[in-house]
Amino acid sequence: MVVALIVTLAVLAWAIIAPDNLAETGTNLQSWVVVNFGWLFTSIMLACLIFLLAIAILPTGKIRLGADDSAPDFSRASWISMLFAAGLGIALVFYGPMEPLTHFLTPPPYETVEAATQDAVVPAIVQGMLHQATLPWTVYALVGGSLAYAAYRRGRLPLISSLFEPVVTNANNRIAGKIIDVFAVLVTLFGTATSLGIGALQIRTGTSIVTGRPLEGNGIIVVIISVLTVLFIISAMTGIQKGIRMMSNLNLGLVIGLAGFVLITGPTLYLLDLVPASIMQFFDRFIDMMSIAPSQGPVEEEFALAWTILFWAWWISWSPFVGMFIAKISRGRTIREYVAVILLVPTSLTTVWFVIFGGTAAKSELDGNPIPIEGSGENVMFDLLGYLPLSGFTNIVVLITIVIFFNTAADSATNVMGSMSQSGRPVPSTPMVIIWGSALGAISLFLLLAGGEDTLSGLQSIMVSASLPFTIILIGIMYCWAKDLARDPVILRQNFATAAIDQGVRRGLDEHNGNFIFGADPVPQSQGAGAEFEKDDPNLSEWYTEVASEEYLSEQAKERDKQEKERETFKESLDADGHAQPVSEADESAPPEQTDTPEKN
């Protein structure tokens, strides 16, 4: 924790003393990373998707994130609402109308449609779906699932470094492991602080629109961040069970209600037509959208730098924070349920949200009601609602939604940083929550006071660049988790059953020419189907390799005659109830003593 705090203070001092230098350095570094490693970011996003689908479809999908009999900690509705709030949050309100509108006015390079026409509507929505829907959740699900598995099923510390235990013993106590954990804390801190700073700007814009008064200057920013910091620290101190769950459930209701209102009062039939069209075009254009690369030309480079590769890097940089939070709330789920829900439910909700708000924004432009994209675009949502009925009320709902998203993101980040700073402690101590919550609020505030949006953008660029080494960590996480899953008791039991049945079939064919049935006759312990199955044996996978091999079966065949005789002797020694009768070592030939139990008629 000390190292993380020192780095935090150093970066904060940099932002205060030389904000322009921070912004310039971040922009240059981000450009270099995107141009030279854009291919890696795209490849990692696809690899994560394929990996998750594989472990969900294969027998590993039956494995539970916890003990075999563990039950989920939260209802499915609460679980989904917390996933939604942590994984998207402010970005949903911000990018929902703004990104599709931007692509509608300026189509992506691979599109041949004319800008600001009906033909440009669906491609614009689909591009936003690519950036915000399924693929971001693949990275979150990978980190969260591997952490939940390691912590709740393997009993390891819930730290990023602990994920490498399958290949490096005691990884979290090694220098490399500690560096990874400190890096995860810093990425969480600065990444969240940057987003919260942008959220504070949105709240200022919304407050100005709701009150009808222009709110400029640093004073309002100080008030907004100070009040919200106190609120999310109090919420974080109540823990996930109360604070985050309550706010997430409330916000999910507000989001659904707001989307339903816009759908009903907006161009309803137009939006309903866009839903299937957008889904079909998403799959049709998926390869084209994923294939865009900086090396294809200056236009493609500019687009990748501003959108696609930027988003991949940004989601990867957020994965330690969001993944660890998802792990905290996902105990008791099977891997199949975990992957299915995380990939399908947020994707579906995000798709509907982008269709409703992006489609309404585009239709507004087509109908001659322009929506200017001012500054970073925090005005778009409010301007869009201004063309619909009850805009005064809906603006207040949006403002409340942003405030709650602000709090849930900061609350979740504070809990995660506190946990990581205390060696994975499930519930961080109150002082630790206060320390990291205060640091998060202070950094958001001072970055805005020092250089405004430019400083925030510069820090965001640095955090995006910091995601480059984490792409390598993601590759390691996939390898280590796959290795763990291959040695999971569920898989080994299945492998053992397969081997045992295989041996039985071979023997039945050899000895009885196929005229046999499987049974469960009692045999000496040394000859049982699980005779060599040692659940505590660290080389259990090697055991399975041996037991399923031809060589092993051949060796067993040589002893069949001896074993058959032992089985017959054992059966003869059973009493009427099928239990083995104790035999005295002093006189093995002595018959068992008579008991007072009456004979059966």
What positions do the PLM features span?
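Alpha-helical transmembrane segments and their helix-start/interface "positive-inside/aromatic belt" motifs
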Residues: 1-5, 37-43, 71-92, 137-138, ...
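N-terminal alpha-helical transmembrane segments of multi-pass membrane transport
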Residues: 1-118, 480, 484-485, 550, ...
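Helix-loop-helix module between adjacent transmembrane segments
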Residues: 2, 6-16, 49-54, 88-92, ...
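Hydrophobic alpha-helical segments of multi-pass membrane transport proteins
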Residues: 7, 40-57, 255-266, 349-359, ...
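Membrane-embedded translocation segments of transport machinery
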Residues: 172, 179, 184-333, 340, ...
